[in-house]
Structures are given as C-alpha cells and as structure tokens.
Amino acid sequence: MALKHFNPITPGQRQLVIVDRSELYKGKPVKSLTEGLSKKGGRNNTGRITVRFQGGGHKRSYRFIDFKRRKLDVVGTVERLEYDPNRTAFIALIRYTDGELAYILAPQRLAVGDQVVAGNFVDVKPGNAMPLSSMPVGTIIHNVELKPGKGGQIARSAGTYAQLVGRDQGMAILRLNSGEQRLVSGACFASVGAVSNPDHGNINDGKAGRSVWRGKRPHVRGVAMNPVDHPHGGGEGRTSGGRHPVTPWGKPTKGKKTRSNKATDKFIMRSRHQRKK
C-alpha cells in the first residue's frame, strides 16, 4: 500500500503523511472474534499511574488474533484484509474449509482469495505456517514462537521479519531485525513472509492531536518539571539538568544496560550490540 501526502490547506496537513488504507475492508470486524477493551489510562489495579503519558484515545474493540496457527492441514481462504487499531500490522480474516473463522497477521503479498495452510510439510509461501525444522534455510519469516505451542512472539510489528540462517542440533538459528542471531527450538512454528504495512515507519502524524487519538498524551521532559517531580527538575531559567541523564526514579538512562535475564543468554549467538561487520 502506498503513502498519502496532502496539500497544506491546514497546518496539521502540511507535514501529514499516512498509509493509504483504501484497499482494506471498510466494515466492522467479526463480532465473535472481538471483545470489549476498557481504557486503563496507564493505571494499575490500585489506580496508580504505572505508565506515564497514556490516556484518552478513540474507543477500540480487541480482535482475537491466532498467533499459534495450530489448525493443521486445514486450508483457509483469505476473506478480507482489515485494519486493526491495536497493532501496526494489518490482519487477514481466514475462512477454513470446515467453516471456522480466524484472524491472522497479514503478511506482505497476501491478497483476498489466497489460500493459506498450517502444517508440518506445506508450501513455502506467504501466510503459511510450519515448524522451523521444516523450512528451507534462508526463508523470510514472521510471528515466530520462542516456545513450542506458546504462540508467535517475534516479528509481529508492521514490516518486520526474521530470517532462518541455519540449523544446529535440533535448534534453528534466526537473524532478527535488530541484527541479533538467536537459537530457537526447531519445533517452534513460524509463518512465512514479512509482516504487512512496511510503510508504517514512513508516516508523519502532522499534528499532536493524532497521537492523542491513539491514547498518547504529551511526553514531558524532566528538565521542564519541578524538583518534586523529577531529578532534572528546577533551576533558575532553562537548565541542562546538571547531572547524567536519569529516570524519574533516579536510575541511569540513555545507554545504561538493563538486561538481567541470564537464563536466555545461551540462546543468543550474536548480540544486537556487536559491531556490524
């Protein structure tokens, strides 16, 4: 899908660049595959703000997406491609031959009328799902599981993908978008292709209001606050903060490594922080 640019007839349209969604389905989602979604406003169950700068935004309903793809060897036909407000990628409505409906993440080059299938030995074409052990080396994939049967967790955002670059003792070696190379069990399922909406990274909201429509409130800098609100706050006139950058809770930020999950270090063959060679 292409990008839409606008003539500057209003200040908010001068910089505006959005994705052309004219080819997507314009009706409502399948009701049996949706549920209500209440606004949290960044608060937890005690009512305290746990995520800052969230609140408001347009009302949404949650679409159930099949990330597991465990309906094996049953052919499904793409009924339509839809917009999903809860994610950056587009979704596809699949009607299986037994009549069941399901939403999946739509990969690039998937069109209405195409057929998709999940199984241990299926064709390598966009939308099909299979174990990593059954895929040819070099395949571009998305919606990759980290644990067999848990459902896809890697490469689900718009335009993202991973690549199967090798195998070793029942494990698959993946190269991720970040440059990281990682070991994943060969029994884990993944879908073929790259995720749809690759132009998402090129959009320009044009005005602050578009962020508000999405439920994002203004992101206030620490140096613009008072000392009671942030370690960088206060001072006479404009200041630089006066110390190394920290979070509102005093922990170093901007480059401080925070990874503490040593249990999965053995699965990372090449860190995303290593220099690109």
Curated annotation (Swiss-Prot):
Keywords: Ribonucleoprotein, Ribosomal protein, RNA-binding, rRNA-binding. One of its GO terms (cellular component) is large ribosomal subunit. One of its GO terms (molecular function) is structural constituent of ribosome. Belongs to the universal ribosomal protein uL2 family. NCBIfam families: rplB_bact. PANTHER family: LARGE RIBOSOMAL SUBUNIT PROTEIN UL2M, RIBOSOMAL PROTEIN L2. This is Large ribosomal subunit protein uL2. The gene is rplB.
